[in-house]
């Protein structure tokens, strides 16, 4: 099979796929997965300005360094936001056990007693809001497009967001070079 013939076959198959999709789906339709979830039950934890929030990304934090799961308060880190302007480094968390961390307390990344941070002394915790999109397939411009799972912090210091949530597409040409 020569390159020209292969290109013709790919074009024919794409056109058939596009026609089937156009018949069944509206442009931008969700085909498989891709559920959108708003979560206003997450909590922010402000750290002291000398700490780096990204060290805790996607980890589990605890109020004790003894062993994994031994802390009385444990939380899954949903998002870690480093120091931005006058905003302190902030962790967005979902509690596993307990309901809050004490102001000024030291937190530990489970499985690493060396990774610690100190919670800010004032205005250290409160409600936040995030939106998540699960992995899914959408029909866009005649193509079935895979969308990776994503989480976005809507309001890091409020659990009452006022946004419209959606996806945008970026088209690019990928070649062999």
Provide a role label for each language-model segment.
Residues 1-177:
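Subunit-assembly interface segments of extracellular/virion macromolecular structures
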């Amino acid at each position: 099979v020569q390159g020209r013939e292969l290109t013709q076959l790919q074009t024919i198959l794409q056109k058939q796929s596009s026609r089937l999709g156009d018949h069944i789906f509206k442009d931008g339709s969700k085909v498989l997965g891709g559920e959108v979830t708003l979560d206003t039950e997450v909590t922010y934890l402000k750290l002291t300005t000398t700490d780096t929030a990204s060290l805790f990304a996607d980890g589990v934090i605890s109020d004790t360094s003894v062993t994994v799961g031994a802390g009385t308060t444990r939380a899954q880190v949903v998002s870690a936001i480093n120091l931005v302007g006058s905003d302190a480094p902030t962790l967005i968390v979902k509690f596993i056990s307990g309901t809050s961390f004490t102001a000024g307390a030291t937190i530990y990344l489970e499985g690493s007693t060396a990774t610690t941070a100190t919670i800010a002394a004032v205005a250290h915790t409160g409600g936040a809001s995030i939106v998540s999109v699960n992995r899914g397939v959408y029909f866009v411009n005649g193509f079935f497009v895979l969308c990776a799972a994503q989480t976005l912090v809507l309001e890091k210091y409020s659990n009452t967001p006022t946004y419209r949530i959606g996806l945008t597409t970026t088209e690019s040409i990928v070649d062999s070079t």
